[in-house]
Amino acid sequence: MKVNLGNCFCLSLSQKKFPLPLASLLVNVPLALMVALGMNLALERPGVTGEMVVLESPIAPEAIFAQGVKAGEAGNYAEAVELFSVVLNLSPDSPETHYNRGLAWERLGNVDQAIADYGRSIALDRYYIPPYINRGNLYSQQQDHHTAIQDFTQAITYDPNRYKAYYNRANSYFQLGQYAQAIADYNRVLVLRPDYINAIYNRGLAHFQAGQLDSSRQDLLFSAQAYLNRGDRRSYLEALDQMSELGL
């Protein structure tokens, strides 16, 4: 079965104002000044570590946030965690920053920290969809599909056009043996994204488990040809192998 879909790093902060004037906020020089003010300071530099100064630039949090996104997208997840933590020192009520730090934690394999940050993001803005989907994926990886379904369903409630939530919920229904619900969700995915081949492939597997062999054969054969048309030979061969294993 093709795996769940996640979300990428959020690229910008919301327009919410920071709770305090930046001139009154203290942050750590080695990280914040290096990023926000462009000073080339190392954390281990004598006389610098632990020194506290005032950042007076009104764009500093946005600049640090942008550097965190850049670090995360480059795969430097530990650095991204540090940068987003600095932003949260300035604005602890930023759902996007908690989400991004959660994603960095997730990429580092720190699932508990990731789930905690996704939870904080949701608590700050219950209508912000990405943390529901990513947290649901983590629950799914832990085989806690019932809790995962709750997160995916909440995402769908707030945004009925979020195809990733339907797709991931379908996968959890599949893992629970609830094949009719899985097929229904794959159908919804294909209404929103008719070209999403993985949903057709997974629906074919669900049809097979539900005893609907003709529909299963049709979906798997269609997905195999679609993969080939896109130049994805590996997925093409996988679909053919799956049909052979299932006797289709």
Curated annotation (Swiss-Prot):
Cited SUPFAM superfamilies: TPR-like
TPR-type repeats, residues: 61-94, 95-128, 129-162, 163-196
Superkingdom per UniProt: Bacteria
GO cellular component: cell outer membrane
Coiled-coil boundaries: none
Disulfide pattern: none
Protein's name in the database: TPR repeat-containing protein slr0751
Annotated source species: Synechocystis sp. (strain ATCC 27184 / PCC 6803 / Kazusa)
Taxonomic lineage: Bacteria, Bacillati, Cyanobacteriota, Cyanophyceae, Synechococcales
